[in-house]
């Protein structure tokens, strides 16, 4: 049992290092204990593809790229829980709708809200978030009691009463019959030590932070697995008393780093000296000095002296183009035309394009309409 960190700024090769280490283990012993790459749900396929694309590995049963949910399912196959029926958001929405009608006479605020458009979906989102962050019906009961004492007929007291009631009833309806995504993490935390995966080496990559349920699952892995390696986008190691300011670019991942160290120390698991990657230039930006400079000095606004030729968008070293538009519609239209040109003329793939805006609500309708007109 040991915990290790691979730290580095964006593009410094953290993922490549993790993949290379997995390939080395496979080359040494194709049939050894499990090797698990724990990544976000949307990255499982690309991670597995990247693992097999290089290194002469045509296939393997030992190494797998898994999300928290798929890892939980693997553990439940061995320790129990797969008999429960998986339930998605639509299923929970229908269950909540039924519960609101069933307990209408006990509700103080929400009795007539079930038929309102979007109400059940919003309530389900709220209850899911509460569960994800460890807010139980009992904790809500305590809060509702305090609100009741302050103002028995107040809006907050009535709202907390109804949320607590429906939360408890939903949990009761799910218990023993259904399995939602949040419950699967609890099964993972409880059952990991008893599963065959407790002999695994684990690499965690692609995360900036974790929910309380994910931290509990990671703690179980740190306590039981042969080794856990966590890759984080962080400029350097931080101690408990030197957390960067809340507006610092690396504040969220520094918090994650410190909390994971504390989990390991509390469990009595040794923490190895962090590996800090500082290649110059960073591999991802090797062909784009302007982007490399932007990443390195994003927080300090340090200017970069470049030849005039680099400012031409057609120049290979021009990694950043700044354009002004008369209004948002013209801005979105120009972006759509540029995307279309790059796809048709430069061979860019749709999946290689991202559109980022500061406030999506200001642009969402315009983007949807304009991109639809352009066939994007």
Predicted feature locations:
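Conserved P-loop NTPase-based nucleic-acid remodeling module centered on helicase motor cores
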Residues: 31-145, 151-154
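Accessory N-terminal region flanking or inserted into the helicase ATPase core
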Residues: 2-6, 14, 102-206, 213, ...
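Flexible, charged surface loops at secondary-structure boundaries
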Residues: 27-32, 194-202, 222-223
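Extended, H/D-rich, highly charged conserved domains that either
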Residues: 202-286
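Anion-coordinating catalytic cores for phosphoryl-, nucleotidyl-, and glycosidic chemistry
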Residues: 2-67, 84, 218-219, 244-246, ...
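Phosphate/oxyanion-binding active-site loops and adjacent basic polyanion-contact surfaces
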Residues: 11-15, 88-92, 177-185, 249-256, ...
């Amino acid at each position: 049992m040991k915990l290790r960190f691979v730290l580095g700024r964006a593009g410094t090769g953290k993922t490549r290092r993790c993949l290379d280490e997995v390939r080395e283990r496979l080359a040494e012993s194709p049939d050894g204990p499990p090797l698990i790459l724990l990544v976000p749900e949307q990255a499982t396929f690309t991670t597995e593809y990247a693992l097999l694309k290089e290194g002469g590995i045509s296939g393997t049963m030992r190494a797998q790229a898994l999300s928290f949910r798929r890892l939980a399912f693997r553990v439940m196959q061995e320790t129990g829980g797969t008999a429960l029926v998986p339930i998605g958001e639509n299923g929970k929405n229908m269950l909540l709708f039924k519960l609101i009608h069933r307990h209408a006479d006990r509700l103080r605020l929400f009795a007539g809200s079930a038929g309102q458009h979007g109400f059940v979906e919003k309530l389900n989102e709220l209850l899911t978030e509460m569960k994800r962050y460890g807010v139980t019906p009992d904790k809500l009961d305590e809060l509702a009691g305090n609100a009741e004492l302050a103002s028995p007929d107040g809006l907050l007291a009535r709202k907390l009463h109804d949320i607590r009631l429906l939360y408890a009833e939903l949990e009761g309806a799910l218990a023993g019959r259904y399995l939602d995504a949040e419950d699967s993490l609890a099964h993972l935390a409880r059952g990991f030590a008893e599963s065959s995966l407790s002999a695994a080496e684990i690499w965690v990559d692609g995360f900036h932070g974790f929910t309380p349920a994910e931290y509990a699952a990671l703690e179980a892995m740190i306590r039981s697995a042969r080794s856990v390696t966590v890759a984080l986008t962080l400029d350097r190691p931080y101690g408990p008393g030197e957390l960067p300011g809340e507006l610092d670019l690396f504040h969220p991942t520094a918090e994650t780093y410190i909390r994971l160290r504390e989990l390991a120390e509390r469990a009595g698991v040794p923490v190895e000296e962090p590996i800090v990657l500082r290649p110059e230039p960073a591999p991802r930006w090797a062909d784009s000095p302007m982007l490399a400079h932007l990443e390195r000095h994003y927080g300090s606004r340090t200017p970069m002296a470049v030849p005039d030729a680099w400012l031409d968008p057609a120049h290979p070293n021009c990694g950043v183009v700044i354009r002004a538009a008369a209004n948002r519609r013209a801005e979105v239209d120009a972006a759509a035309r540029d995307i279309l040109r790059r796809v048709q003329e430069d061979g860019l793939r749709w999946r290689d394009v991202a559109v980022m805006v500061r406030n999506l609500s200001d642009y969402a309708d315009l983007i949807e309409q304009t991109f639809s007109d352009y066939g994007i």
